[in-house]
Each structure stands twice: as structure tokens, then as C-alpha cells.
Amino acid sequence: MENYQEQATKFLKDTNTRFKVKYFDYAYYFPQDKEQREIYKVTLKTPKGSYTFKFGQSISNQGQEPTPYDVLACLTKYEVGNFEQFCSEFGYDTDSRTAERTFKSVVKEWENISRIYTAEQITLLQEIN
């Protein structure tokens, strides 16, 4: 796991990204959650701009602040495509309102990532998984 953390820390340094995590709430995060989890507000700030979003910590990591690796590994790193492609790729029903909300959230995340990072930096981000 140490290698993963080092990779994420190196990415932040190489891209001049400030990483900030702040506790936000203890609640249900995903629509299908059966257990509550810690929710944090995460800010990624680069020379191109900043992006603040909520991050639901893994239930198995309760009491631990998310690390850069925890967050960066979960980010959308590729263009999403259209709704039908998204549903086909991830097994969603195209008639599902939940799928549509999820799709819109993923598109918004991708738009923010591609706004604050260059194409070259996104290629580096894609290596964190």
C-alpha cells in the first residue's frame, strides 16, 4: 500500500496540487447504503483552478481521514461518453432515474477534473488506481 500512497503524493507534488480534507458529516452517502459512513469535503487546488466535492470514506476505514490515494484512485479519469454508453459499460438500466443521476454526477466530476488538470496530468492521474 505504501507504493500507492507514494504514487499519489508524487502526483500531487508534480502537478502542484494542494490537497485538503475536512470532515463534513456522518450519514448515508450512496443511495444503496445500508450503513452510515464518514463524509468529507475534499478540495483539489491546482494552478488551473480548484474543485471541491464530497467524498464518502470506506466503511472499513472509519475514523481515518481519506488519504490522497483513497481520493485520487476513485476519481473519474476518462471521458464518460453518452448516457447509453455509460449504462452499457457499467450495467445500468437506461430507464433508471438512479442511473441518470449517477451519470450526471460522473459527467460533472469529469468536467471538473479536466478543468483543473491538463491532458498530460490526467494521463498521470489515470495511473493511480
Predicted regions: what they are:
Residues E2-A27:
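Negatively charged, low-complexity tracts enriched in Asp/Glu with abundant Ser/Thr
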Residues Y23-L125:
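Acidic, low-complexity, intrinsically disordered interaction modules
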Residues M1-E2, Q121-N129:
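Short intrinsically disordered terminal tails
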